[in-house]
């Protein structure tokens, strides 16, 4: 059997195991998936093997089928509205498990990959054992947690004993990662109000209040305001929060914009003794090209560039950075990717 066919057969098997009416459920999903309806999402009625029926969003059904596709076992309980996701750990012989409300899968579609990677949901928190570092704990599951802790996309920087300015700190995942790797202090900058509040909770859950300093703001080359807009927590990781007035129009939800100079002065960051991390969906162009005098003060940089989204060239950034840094792309390509730079 071709390897590319096997995952889809698992998804069909999963539908048969989860639902008594698996055939019409799959038909409804297929019609939606291939755009054969004008409805962008919608719901489907599923009938569980333990009795009862429940309506779930098609986006939730997609996550359930994906779970089976990647090798998890999913069991749906129509009575409680919960799903049990189970994955056998072939290394340790243990089971990774998550028992979660079905509606939570709609906003946390990274859940199947998390369970497969070793995360466990105890009904309240997501936890994962990190070799040599203990257990990390988070309120919700998002894709960036897997990128940071499972893929270790930020492993290239040497943070032990250093100050780290973490721009685009989201819910604290990267800040907590840096703290566990021995950072002396992490200044975690996040403009989205709900993501920022969740970051505060996650910092407390991991007992890192003495290491991580949260800042509810965005980074820019000039002080002022940036526009948040009507963006969810999950969507903010793929949204460029532009300075207010950028592109015209009013903005109902704003957050303060801070500069590197302000952060350096306020927190006593010493030149040559700090790391700058940026994952701010485009602000790297503004900061590197328009505030380079402060960028060059950092010992190492690691940032995700978004050249395609910003309709700019990666070469613009590298031409400026190559004045003082040795830079290399550690993942991605010309359109989007992660750049690591060390000061000469």
Functional labels for PLM-detected ranges:
Residues 1-344:
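Phosphate/nucleotide-binding beta-alpha loop and adjacent structural elements of enzyme active sites
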